[in-house]
UniProtKB/Swiss-Prot annotation:
Organism of origin: Haloquadratum walsbyi (strain DSM 16790 / HBSQ001)
Domain S1-like: 8-82
SMART domains on file: eIF1a
SUPFAM superfamilies from the UniProt entry: Nucleic acid-binding proteins
Protein name: Translation initiation factor 1A 1
Matching Pfam families: eIF-1a (PF01176)
Membrane in keyword set: no
Organism phylogeny: Archaea, Methanobacteriati, Methanobacteriota, Stenosarchaea group, Halobacteria
A GO molecular function held by the record: translation initiation factor activity
Length: 96
């Protein structure tokens, strides 16, 4: 057994070229949240319909956000990490 298997870590979804890590800071309602992104920007992110009522997003959740091309202060949430996955990302130094 390797060290990775002993710790229980597994492959995590990493951001694509147009995605950034973010932490949810505020729930705005109407399927919108405020997120603090790893690139230093604070954005209003939209929870897409495919995630509504299937994947519940709360404050302090770690998510992936795809900023809009035409309006950089807004974006779409594309992925939510479980608590254990977020802890693993913090241990690896990918997020704070």
């Amino acid at each position: 057994m390797s060290d990775d298997e002993n710790r229980g870590s597994h492959d995590l979804r990493m951001p694509d070229d147009d995605e950034v890590f973010a932490v949810v800071t505020n729930m705005l309602g109407a399927n919108r949240v405020t997120v603090r992104c790893a690139d230093g920007n604070e954005r209003t992110a939209r929870i897409p319909g495919r995630m509504q009522k299937r994947i519940w997003i709360r404050e302090d959740d770690v998510v992936l956000v795809e900023p809009w091309d035409w309006q950089d202060e807004k974006g779409d949430i594309t992925w939510r990490y479980e608590k254990s996955e977020a802890d693993q990302l913090r241990e690896e130094g990918r997020i704070r």
